[in-house]
Amino acid sequence: MNEIQKYIAANEPQIMEDLFSLIRIPSISALPEHHDDMLACAERWAQLLLEAGVDEALVMPSQGNPIVFAQKIVDPDAKTVLVYAHYDVMPAEPLELWKSQPFEPEIRDGYIWARGADDDKGQSFIQVKAFEYLLKNGLLRNNVKFIFEGEEEIGSPSLEAFCEEHKELLKADVILVSDTSMLGADLPSLTTGLRGLAYWEIEVTG
């Protein structure tokens, strides 16, 4: 067992509970009735980022749902990594197709089943925990910034204006996106570019 595996094993109960606390919040950006849940999820993320060791974690207003910004500056002259993720999720309907409650995580066959466990709370949580491990073990060599938005599932309508307004705050040398695909369960992939959204309407007759 390597040092990372030992760290996970020693902290697994708390790690799982922290992740589950995020998943339990129904942060559905497409439904206005979940407005309060969006804020609750952003605030929970800010709390977890502070616990991970960032210098500051802010829940910042945007034209829509709040955006979480956090940073850890280890050396003003070092390179800076900006981690992008989103905390909003899609609606869970049709509920009758779920074997368990979508916002009550359940572990089955070694997998976490819940809305947001994969897209995108799970991936972003892993990156925050990786940051925490590096920081606690004196291995963090770069500055790290985090930006977590709450509107990715509806096309990120507020993100561009937010980034334009906060250029200096978000300045970085490289961006790490935690919301891309894998070619297979045992075959990680590296996505080097994203081109936005495209929509088609297909009508089939006959």
Spans of model-derived segments:
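N-terminal helical capping/dimerization or prosegment-like subdomains
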Residues: N2-L95
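Short coil-to-beta-strand
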Residues: I15-D18, Q101, A198-E201
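Short glycine-aspartate micro-motif
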Residues: T80-L82, D173-V177, Y199-E201
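Acidic/histidine-rich catalytic neighborhood of metal-dependent amide-processing enzymes
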Residues: D118-G193
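Active-site metal-coordination/substrate-binding segment of hydrolases
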Residues: A78-F148
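Fold-independent oxyanion-binding glycine-rich loops
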Residues: Q63, A85-Y87, D109, A117, ...
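Beta-strand secondary-structure signal
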Residues: F20, F69, K145, Y199-E203
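Flexible glycine/proline-rich, aromatic-decorated loop/lid segments
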Residues: S189-T205
